[in-house]
Amino acid sequence: MFKNKVLLITGGTGSFGNAVLQRFLNSDFAEIRIFSRDEKKQEDMRIALKNDKVKFYIGDVRNYDSIDDALRGVDYVFHAAALKQVPSCEFYPMEAVLTNVQGAENVMRAAIANGVKRCVVLSTDKAVYPINAMGISKAMMEKVMVAKSRLCDPEKTVLSATRYGNVMASRGSVIPLFLDQLQSGKPLTITDPKMTRFLMSLDESVDLVLYAFEHAQPGDIFVQKAPASTVGDLAQAMKEMLESDSEVKVIGTRHGEKLYESLLSREEMARADDLGDYYRIPADSRDLNYDKYFVEGEVAIPTFDDYTSHNTQRLDVEGVKQTLMKLDIIREALNA
């Protein structure tokens, strides 16, 4: 489906963008466009890749004209540009709105205007029962995606989303922080050892995007089933792997953090399709004419639990070690 097509990745110099780019470099895409604000990161990527297939566009998703220009002639879009640091978004919530909501709306609106065939937007588990500005902004992005999917012609453009838990070793995540602390002989700083988080690799995140590109219907949200770990077990696993005797300091939760995360709400689980490795949350196809539902009669309401990092498969320390060994950053540290 990608032969001689053009792909654009917003936020393409970040962790997700890099992973997607590496997967698609040897594909049949005619051109891959990297759209981001940071000219230095683009220059570093250009020098590292030396690949004529990859084109670079400097711009900001907040600026509709810049993303509209970049999307001319594009067939597929992966929207990864975002503000994702929870504490920062707590202090600057309107910045999160401008990038994660308005910016995402700009991308989707420009995708529709330019006849992009498929546009997949990246969301997060923090969008489910959100308590922080980052999660709220991503929840709004999902709502915008679903609303726009109702209005655009699916024969021309299909909008969908992928929702992730914690992506291991991505920029700003805890594993690179722990690794730096252990290698420097510093104490490990843990917010709450009982806090649980989903564990997902960058490769798995790309697999999910590919699945969405190939299978999405308008308004779909795709979620990968993932194991989880406590932060305490993650820290212990890394200490043992690096044979470190660093002390552990519990510093308490940061602004906006939750004890556990949810990938699907109870309401979403009630209507989700179980696809084996993934869940598909279809868009609610009902309209605002609720009178007809009284005429049609009662509908049974199924009861489900939400899908959380507390009730999914829980990895112990040994299980976390096996999972961490899949990461390049860990293997490189052990071989150093």
Predicted regions: what they are:
Residues T10, L71-A80, V121:
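Rossmann-fold scaffold of SDR-type NAD(P)-dependent oxidoreductases
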Residues K55-Y76:
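Conserved Rossmann-fold cofactor-binding substructure of NAD(P)-dependent oxidoreductases
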Residues D28-K41:
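Conserved glycine-rich Rossmann-like NAD(P)H-binding loop of the short-chain dehydrogenase/reductase
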Residues K5-S27:
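N-terminal Rossmann NAD(P)H-binding glycine-rich loop of SDR-like oxidoreductase domains
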Residues A113, K143, A147-A336:
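Strand-loop microenvironment adjacent to phosphate/nucleotide-handling motifs in alpha/beta enzyme folds
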Residues H79, L83-K143, A147:
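Conserved Rossmann-fold NAD(P)-dependent oxidoreductase catalytic core, especially the SDR/UDP-sugar
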Residues F56, A96, C119, L159-T162:
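Hydrophobic/aromatic anchor residues within beta-strands of the central parallel beta-sheet
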Residues S36, I58, L98, D192, ...:
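Conserved residues in the N-terminal Rossmann fold of short-chain dehydrogenase/reductase
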